[in-house]
UniProtKB/Swiss-Prot annotation:
Disulfide bonds: none annotated. This is Cytochrome b. Keywords: Electron transport, Heme, Iron, Membrane, Metal-binding, Mitochondrion, Mitochondrion inner membrane, Respiratory chain, Transmembrane, Transmembrane helix, Transport, Ubiquinone. Heme 1 (or BL or b562) is low-potential and absorbs at about 562 nm, and heme 2 (or BH or b566) is high-potential and absorbs at about 566 nm. A ubiquinone binds at residue 201. It comes from Sorex excelsus (Lofty shrew). Heme b b566 binds at residues 97, 196.
Amino acid sequence: MTNLRKTHPLMKIINNSFIDLPAPSNISSWWNFGSLLGVCLIIQILTGLFLAMHYTSDTMTAFSSVTHICRDVNYGWLIRYLHANGASMFFICLFLHVGRGLYYGSYMYLETWNIGVLLLFAVMATAFMGYVLPWGQMSFWGATVITNLLSAIPYIGSDLVEWIWGGFSVDKATLTRFFAFHFILPFIIAALAGVHLLFLHETGSNNPSGLSSDADKIPFHPYYTIKDILGVLLLILVLTSLVLFSPDLLGDPDNYTPANPLNTPPHIKPEWYFLFAYAILRSIPNKLGGVLALVLSILILAVMPFLHTSKQRSMMFRPFSQCLFWILVADLLTLTWIGGQPVEHPYIIIGQLASILYFLLILVIMPITSLLENNLLKW
């Protein structure tokens, strides 16, 4: 009798994706982040579901409903901080996952990569709307500043902003619709992640060498299931440590003050995971130019496959490209730091230089260096 997992229509899908899937024998821990992102998404959906049971999306009661969750609901504080810090873990895994893709040339799988870029945008949109929901000072002003950026779009801009707001300012209508979208988007993300996996399994995983691994495959289970479980345990360890010891480490104290449209906080800034893009936005004095730079800072990932000039897929055997990759990482960390600083000298010029370097590295320096490496290797 044939094994049920190989014949049952539902079990067969699970079997071919997580059990009998042929995987390269040499993929490192950098390949763990896909499964970690799946775990993060499950954590976020579950904690979010329980928060939604007690949350009210009304400007008058939103802030106090979050306070009620923390004070009166059984383990409400735990659920709330798991959700807030779970988002931070989500983005840490996302950035490492994308970084791995850039380093090892995973972007050569076009469909998988493009769905991934779409997923990144969807997660960023979800996180932004989630940050608005507690209706603290930074929630309100963050929503006001970021939605206002759309007014830079010629002709339709101001109408578009009022349409998104559902009025003439960020108010009840905005909060209600943001809650609705924040609730539905994670399920769309889950569906997109399924498509992401579907396309990945059409080609099979890449590996650190960037060479074909068809001659040397091993079954996903038990080898990589065990490896993924170790990753998940480490993720949960870091998340619970953060939640139980310093839950507000990555948050903004201003968000513990109820939203007040008449009082602007001295420094409006988003959560840490958006700071690099926020720094790029601020480094351009022109509003439309800043918005374009902001969008392009993420959208530039979609053109990575077309900027690949090397004869080798991975950076494993390309020391010059490796140096440039780590300069790019340092540049992004610099941008993240600048995004959290006030707009004054010397932060302005540092931010502008870091923004120029970011685009120069990706669009010009790295492709030229790859061509140079081809010539050095006489390929």
